[in-house]
Curated annotation (Swiss-Prot):
Pfam families: Defensin_4. The keyword Transcription does not apply. Keywords: Disulfide bond, Ion channel impairing toxin, Nematocyst, Secreted, Toxin. It is found in: Secreted; Nematocyst. This is Toxin Bcg III 28.78. GO terms for molecular function: ion channel inhibitor activity; toxin activity. Disulfide bonds join 6-31. InterPro entries: BDS_K_chnl_tox, Myo_ane_neurotoxin_sf. It comes from Bunodosoma cangicum. GO terms for cellular component: extracellular region; nematocyst. Belongs to the sea anemone type 3 (BDS) potassium channel toxin family. The keyword Disulfide bond applies.
Length: 37
């Protein structure tokens, strides 16, 4: 997994089934929002 921002929402997301963040926005696969990360 790779910590990065998903969509236009603020905060850090963890990709459980994807390597990297496409274009720095948007996401595919499992993306869970983690508070405090």
């Amino acid at each position: 997994g790779v910590p990065c921002k998903c969509g236009s929402k603020k905060g850090v997301y963890w990709f459980g089934q994807i390597t990297g963040c496409p274009g720095g926005h948007g996401y595919k696969g499992s993306c869970n929002y983690l508070l405090g990360k």
